[in-house]
Amino acid sequence: MTTKINKIGIFGKPNNKNLYEIIEKIFIVVENIDPKIHMFVEKSTAECSSIKSKMFISKLSVNIETVENLKNSIDLAVILGGDGTLLGIARQVASAGVYVLGINQGKLGFTTDLDVNDLQHNLGSLLRGEGIVEKRSMFDVRVLRKKNKTEEALDIFNAPAFNDAVVSRGAISHMVELDVFIDNSYLQTIRGDGLIVCTPTGSTAYALSVNGPIIHPNLEALALVPVAPQAL
């Protein structure tokens, strides 16, 4: 990793009030490596940890901003939590090309695999330019709706997906029937409880629980995984 990190944003799991100690450790590591780095803490994370704007942690001043403001002003997002926390933040900062680093505070971490006890070594190495950037695929999800065949479709939902997108039967008791197209070419009709479209990262999440394939993170691929399909 050759990009110089000048601004770091810290994001925590919502409503987690036990993050001050680890945030303090991060500040100490950063101060030891490069005290000129500007440190930011996401607003709700700061509130839960009783951190005030312009206060000092170690010898570094704290800046507090919302996620929306931070994504366009930081180089690195340090996320404290499990995979769910990382997924939520990654989706919000992806459009700005921010590097994401996960420190596991949950029970299981496929993407937040950095141990809090190894911060001095691992975070320090990254800040010295010795880190390796691992790129992960994402895709855009759009939901179009029209009242009849002649009416123009309206775009009612649009969002990036880091893990997966799921079309499901919801609360209805019967199966759904889905016509699947790839690049406007018909593939097949699936009858069942739903369909998961997942990235390589998402292949170890919901898709894995319904016997989907595990895809290597470096592959540029999407998996289509039926949920409880009606098939012989």
Task: Walk through the language-model features, giving the residues of each.
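Short glycine/serine/threonine-rich phosphate/pyrophosphate-binding segments
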Residues: L19, G84-A90, T204-S209
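Gly/Ser-rich helix-loop-strand patches that form or flank binding pockets
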Residues: G88, Q92-G106, F110
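Short glycine-rich anion-binding loops that position phosphate/pyrophosphate groups of nucleotides
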Residues: N15, D83-T85, L108, T201-S203
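Catalytic core of DAGKc-family lipid kinases
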Residues: K107-D193
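Redox-cofactor binding/interface segments in oxidoreductases and associated redox assembly factors
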Residues: I10, I79, V197
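N-terminal glycine-rich phosphate/adenylate-binding segment common to multiple enzyme folds
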Residues: K71-L76, L80, T85-G88
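Gly/Ser/Thr-rich active-site loops/lids in small-molecule metabolic enzymes
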Residues: S185-L232
